[in-house]
Amino acid sequence: MSIIINGKKTANDLCEELSKKIDILKKEYNVFPCLKVILVGSNPASQVYVRNKQRKAESIGISSETIVLPDSISEDELIEKVNTLNEDSSVHGILVQLPLPKHISASRIINTVSVEKDVDGFHDENVGRLVKGEKNCLIPCTPKGSLHLIKSVENNLSGKNAVIIGRSNIVGKPMFHLLLQENCTVTILHSQSRDLADYCSKADIVVAAVGKPNFVQPDWIKKGAIVIDVGINSINIGNQSKLVGDVDFEGVKEKVKAITPVPGGVGPMTIAFLMINTLVAACLQKGVDPSDFIA
């Protein structure tokens, strides 16, 4: 019988444990983790994401504030705001919510955030540390959360064939390096790839992050595979909208060893690992070994 991986419960369990660690950090080390989120403009989806992040942070003892800026702000003004937070020693994590307005370079803003406070893990230096397999670096939250879900089903991934569909800097590429570090044989598929079904049919692990509803078909997936669906797409059925992933969940779920649902799979894990990254960042900035708090 297939396992429907409950990302919401796993994330809640992680955050419950994290809350206890934060209490210890405050009482024994006098470290009070603080996360600042910058939201530029009034994108409704971004507002929801930011609100969820702030609520979760506050619920586990992380001080959190959302700084809302107009979408007319210039790139230089935004950089100045980020630098103010960089210089504030009471702030341990800085997150600039993406996407940004078209007149602002996301790459430039991401790389303005201090490496030590880059809780998204998007800074070029943190990307390099991930590629090199360094310990205690800040790793993008969605891939890290996805790996945790995979290992909750199959702890030893050595020698497994893994396929990632999607090559974004946020999910696909960091996921590649995380699975490589687990000694998987990893293939990335993308919009120019041929024979996607053939590659997927040989995979023990499939991570779908392509942003196309129900893109991955049942006959692509081999029996007993682990499928992680990172996609979140809104489709209209009749007069109602429904959230679905990149995988044909109903068609795939009966043949796999395990699969994440949408919603309730990877999404909550992204927020949980943002909280973990904030704790790691606070520890590193205050000279505390994060491994004392994070397994």
From Swiss-Prot:
Catalytic activity of the protein: (6R)-5,10-methylene-5,6,7,8-tetrahydrofolate + NADP(+) = (6R)-5,10-methenyltetrahydrofolate + NADPH; (6R)-5,10-methenyltetrahydrofolate + H2O = (6R)-10-formyltetrahydrofolate + H(+)
Keywords for the protein's UniProt record, in alphabetical order: Amino-acid biosynthesis, Histidine biosynthesis, Hydrolase, Methionine biosynthesis, Multifunctional enzyme, NADP, One-carbon metabolism, Oxidoreductase, Purine biosynthesis
Binding site for NADP(+): G166, R167, S168, S191, I232
Keyword field contains Lipid biosynthesis: no
One CC-aspect GO term: cytosol
Function noted in UniProt: Catalyzes the oxidation of 5,10-methylenetetrahydrofolate to 5,10-methenyltetrahydrofolate and then the hydrolysis of 5,10-methenyltetrahydrofolate to 10-formyltetrahydrofolate.
Assembly information from the UniProt record: Homodimer.
Name assigned to this protein: Bifunctional protein FolD
Source organism per UniProt: Wolbachia pipientis subsp. Culex pipiens (strain wPip)
